[in-house]
Amino acid sequence: MKRLVVCWLVAAACRSPAIPEANRFPAGTGFTARHVTVDGTTLRYIDSGRGTPVVFLHGLGASMYAWRKNLEPIARAGYRVIAFDNRGFGFSDKPATGYDNASYARLTVALLDSLHLPDAVLVGHSMGGAVAAEVAIAHPERVRGLVLIGSAGLGAREPRLFRVGRWPLLGPLLFAFRGRGLTERLLQATYADPRKVSDADVDQYYAPVAEPAYGRALRAVLREFRFDALAGRLDHIRAPTLVLWGEADRLVPITLGRTLAAGIPRAAFLSVPGAGHSVQEEAPDEVNRLLIRFLKDGLARVPGDLAFGHWADIFPQPSG
């Protein structure tokens, strides 16, 4: 164990300069980054398109860059897409506290209020899925539909790095040395095929990590956020729900995805072959196809008593 920690510290100490602000996502796209202050936190966000609003919530250690391959196709299909760097991540504020599940849910609702949205479809990945589900439980009237992608909420085996990060002495030291190489390895672990992670991807993920407040915020998340908070509460989710999983997810096992879907009254479970935890990044075409199908057909056609596994007419499997 000590040897592993030392290796992490040595790797993390290899710091690299972050990309310039002018090159940060969404630079080079048709989107524009905006800022809004809600619930005492200034959030960096994207808001584009018309139609039913779809709000994207990223996972632990990520930012709205995690949705770079999904936003434009969903907007082009006729939807209003909203993505944001959540509190403590990306280039949004990183206060000392406010990282528990209820606080993140309240922040999400405050963002909807600031955008004058009575409700929206929430799409959450990993930790963002747990936040989206928390909103659906605590504020059901604000959630028109729910998409949970490789979602946290039922507990999963944490990377050892995160467990060490909670240690009183080693935690601050570990997160003080956040190198680009460490970011690259963590990102590759979320893919079934690590070769699909590009240098540009690593640059974008590393840019906020290099900020001084990032380590403190990440430690606060690991202290305050419960990654098993949905256990025993899934039947409180009333929104029509699509649960998506990469079949090669090594961080949150696919068995948890099936359990998640089975516990939600109006849910369907679908898996994507050959994709890991970051399935929306690794297999974007398939994820976008399923998302659009859910938005076009699933929201309107799902009856309140629909049982798990009966969505074959909405989501036919591709032939061949």
Regions found by a protein language model. Give the residues of each.
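Short glycine-enriched nucleophile-adjacent loop
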Residues: 129-140, 146
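Conserved alpha/beta-hydrolase catalytic His-Asp/Glu region
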Residues: 162-163, 176-236
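Flexible "cap/lid" loop of the alpha/beta hydrolase fold
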Residues: 137, 146-175
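Active-site loop/oxyanion-hole signature of alpha/beta-hydrolase fold enzymes
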Residues: 29, 38-39, 46-48, 76, ...
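Catalytic active-site module of serine/aspartate enzymes centered on a nucleophile-bearing elbow/loop
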Residues: 267-268, 272-318
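Short beta-strand/loop motif that positions the catalytic acidic residue
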Residues: 237, 243-245
